[in-house]
A protein has these predicted regions:
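Short alpha-helical donor nucleotide-sugar binding micro-motif in glycosyltransferases
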Residues: 46, 217-218, 225-230
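Membrane-proximal helix-turn-helix segments that form the acceptor-binding/catalytic region
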Residues: 95-114
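A short, active-site helix/loop in glycosyltransferases that binds the activated sugar's phosphate group
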Residues: 109-135, 145
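Conserved donor-binding/catalytic core segment of Leloir-type glycosyltransferases
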Residues: 151-185, 191
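Nucleotide-activated donor-binding/catalytic signature segment of Leloir-type glycosyltransferases, i.e.
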Residues: 201-224
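Aromatic "clamp/platform" in nucleotide-sugar-dependent glycosyltransferases that forms part
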Residues: 238
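Short hydrophobic beta-strand element within catalytic cores of glycosyltransferases
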Residues: 255-258
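Conserved acidic donor-binding segment of nucleotide-sugar-dependent glycosyltransferases
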Residues: 272-280, 289-294
Length: 327
């Protein structure tokens, strides 16, 4: 049995699913980073496959899902990010309207089944696209545990957030509020880890204080080191389909300070602090409040992720979704 695995960028969560599926089946990759593809080449790949598995409803999944439908082959589509979002106040999400809305809705409606990474994302695709609830299976992300037992002792007063730096993420990922909060808590070191994609880094430097460090792009090992080092992880987002970086940080023992946007409450549970909105003063106060958290609270953060989002749950969910379609 062969799966055609379709994606636009080979990011960490895509790689995880790819490897989990390869444990059981033959998987061929189809990567399309841009808008335009050769339909005949896509058609050849779909003909060879028994099932199409795609990540997000966008330009790269339009032809594979469409051809699968025409050839009466089953397809699975993972949704729950820009493709299902409608957040006009920050200009985010395909469901705001126009060509991208029509493209995403066409693709979503023609997939045989949908996978959402959170209950929030399931509700969002049902609400914004109008698909039936029973078409959507919730399969939470599985977070690989690369950290092991937490070391004893206090951590540095470091508040961490992880995001590519771009104009859209200034508001969506709460980067503006993060660096502004740093000015209100000068005794804390604020660290923004992520590649600079445009000149929005200049605005953040103007807004932030001297206690903000901008690392730029880092290796996986360097990112893991920051997770181990930080006391607090801040996710001041306006929309999150899951919040994988929060889960990774908690697995490393960071205490989360998050907004109630999207699936973030679903991820953190009763650990850390939840804020109604990305207010810099509230973020600064929350960071101060959890800085002194001891080993017991860090262990709770780690156990929350180990219990609810292990890799085995993702593996079982993907296998069940594929086998259901194959009959």
């Amino acid at each position: 049995m062969q799966i055609l695995f379709v994606y636009s960028r080979r990011v960490s969560f895509v790689e995880i699913d790819l490897e989990l599926l390869r444990e059981r089946w033959e998987v061929r990759e189809w990567a399309q980073p841009g808008r335009f593809a050769n339909p005949l080449a896509v058609l050849r790949e779909v003909r060879r496959a028994d099932i199409v598995f795609g990540w997000f409803a966008s330009w790269h999944t339009f032809w594979p899902i469409t051809f699968a439908r025409l050839l009466r082959k089953p397809s699975l589509l993972v949704v729950g990010g820009f493709d299902t979002a409608n957040v006009p106040e920050i200009g985010y999400g395909y469901q705001q309207g126009g060509t991208t809305r029509r493209l995403a809705q066409w693709t979503i409606r023609r997939a045989s089944r949908l996978i959402a990474n959170s209950h929030y994302s399931k509700g969002e695709v049902v609400r914004n696209v109008g698909v039936r609830e029973e078409k959507v299976r919730v399969v939470h992300h599985g977070v690989p545990d690369v950290f092991g037992a937490l070391p004893e002792g206090d951590r540095e007063p470091v508040a961490l957030t992880v995001s590519n730096v771009a104009w859209l993420s200034i508001e969506r990922k709460g980067l503006r509020a993060f660096v502004q909060a740093a000015r209100l808590a000068p005794e804390v070191r604020f660290v923004l880890v992520g590649q600079w994609l445009d000149r929005s880094i200049d605005l953040l430097r103007e807004l932030g204080g001297d206690n903000v460090e901008y690392t730029g792009r880092v290796s996986d090992d360097e990112l893991e080191a920051w997770y181990r080092r930080a006391s607090v992880y801040v996710q001041a987002s306006r929309h999150e389909g899951f919040g994988l970086a929060v889960a990774e940080a908690m697995l490393a023992g960071c205490i989360p300070v998050v907004t109630t946007a999207g699936a973030l409450p679903e991820v953190v549970g009763d650990v850390g602090v939840q804020l109604d909105r990305p207010d810099p003063e509230a973020i600064a106060d929350a960071v101060r409040a959890v800085l002194g958290a001891g080993g017991e609270e860090r262990a709770r953060a780690r156990e929350r992720i180990r219990e609810h989002f292990p890799l085995d749950v993702r593996r079982a969910g993907l296998v069940a979704a594929v086998e259901e379609l194959l009959g």
